[in-house]
Amino acid sequence: MNCKQCDQPTSGKSKYCAAHKAEARAKFNAMCEIERLERASRQDQYQQWIYAMSALAEAAYLATTPQAMVVYETAGLTDIPKENGNSWYVSEGVCGFAWIVIKPATSSFAKWLIKNKIGYKNYYGGWVIPMSYLIPNMTQSMERAESAARCCAKFLRDQNINAYAESRMD
């Protein structure tokens, strides 16, 4: 059997002669090195995104003023306040949580999150980054967490990542 690029006999099971086999191997190794460098660059970029999202989330969280509420004891199962009952002022509004959903979980960014143990699998598909990861010292204010999640989801969409914010009242 002859080489694909010349009339020399092939080397072993290769489709190239010894000279062209070495040349093809060098090209392949160079391609692998370029891919490795691109992957490392992409991973550094993802880490920078996490830092940026953390800063954006904290800024949005602090800039949001939740609607305060007053909680009071009721007379039985009605909305009528209990006479001489206790009442509490809640400056942070309703309690709840917020998170970012990234779909599909097979995207490069989602795989990087999985590898770095950031977030968890979403029940309905995709990958979740909870706001408590990006803002570790946050309160249970749902309005503040929602604001931070929306800001981070927009940042990811600007980076061409399919992401959206979700929340739940506690």
List each model region and its residues.
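Short Cys/His-rich zinc-binding micro-motifs
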Residues: 1-11
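Cysteine-rich micro-motifs
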Residues: 12-23
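Contiguous alpha-helical segments
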Residues: 22-32
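N-terminal leader/targeting segments
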Residues: 30-115, 123
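Acidic, low-complexity, intrinsically disordered interaction modules
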Residues: 122-132
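Short, compact, well-ordered microdomains
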Residues: 130-170
